[in-house]
């Protein structure tokens, strides 16, 4: 990292108290103010949860529709051999609608010109053959995130409106996108409250003690800001 880049980080970190957990609106303002990226950075929310991720029922994974969108434009590909579903997906705003044969050719040629794939369930046996290619790129459709569905047009509509995925890692940490630094504070706050409410509802019944141990908000290039956990 350049000396200039290091100084930007130091200045950002010194502009607030990293040991304090801030009210949500104030935390958002700090994140917006301390983002030192030259582009419209993403805003990410991170939860440290008291989970035993070795147990299947404590592995949180899914997607959440943010009321004010993600602020990010995504390219959605739909794969289905059903002609009627292809028409509906196109009408819903899918960027690409392909059949299984076309998709297979794209994968073989390493053409991954899309951000999210939505699949008709009938396509999963085919996609399963390419899990080693799709999985590491985060492109394998999954029922838990709503990207394996008999109604792909609905998934396209939700993704275009602003749907964000979340997933627990091995340390019991959940990351999710909640917007862009250019968004109004009020809109970011509303998005974040939606995610926090969801995480609270998803608390596994077997969890004892403090469930949400820590919440941190940050921009792509910016310091993490602790968020006060409201009971």
Swiss-Prot record:
Cellular component terms per the entry's GO annotation: large ribosomal subunit
A single GO BP: translation
Domain of life of the source: Bacteria
InterPro entries linked to this entry: Ribosom_uL1_bac-type (IPR005878), Ribosomal_uL1 (IPR002143), Ribosomal_uL1-like (IPR023674), Ribosomal_uL1/biogenesis (IPR028364), Ribosomal_uL1_3-a/b-sand (IPR016095), Ribosomal_uL1_CS (IPR023673)
GO molecular function: rRNA binding; structural constituent of ribosome; tRNA binding
Entry keyword set: Repressor, Ribonucleoprotein, Ribosomal protein, RNA-binding, rRNA-binding, Translation regulation, tRNA-binding
Disulphide bonds in the chain: none
Function: Binds directly to 23S rRNA. The L1 stalk is quite mobile in the ribosome, and is involved in E site tRNA release.
Family: Belongs to the universal ribosomal protein uL1 family.
Quaternary structure, from the entry: Part of the 50S ribosomal subunit.
HAMAP family documented for this protein: Ribosomal_uL1_B
Name of the featured protein: Large ribosomal subunit protein uL1
Species this protein is from: Mycoplasmopsis agalactiae (strain NCTC 10123 / CIP 59.7 / PG2) (Mycoplasma agalactiae)
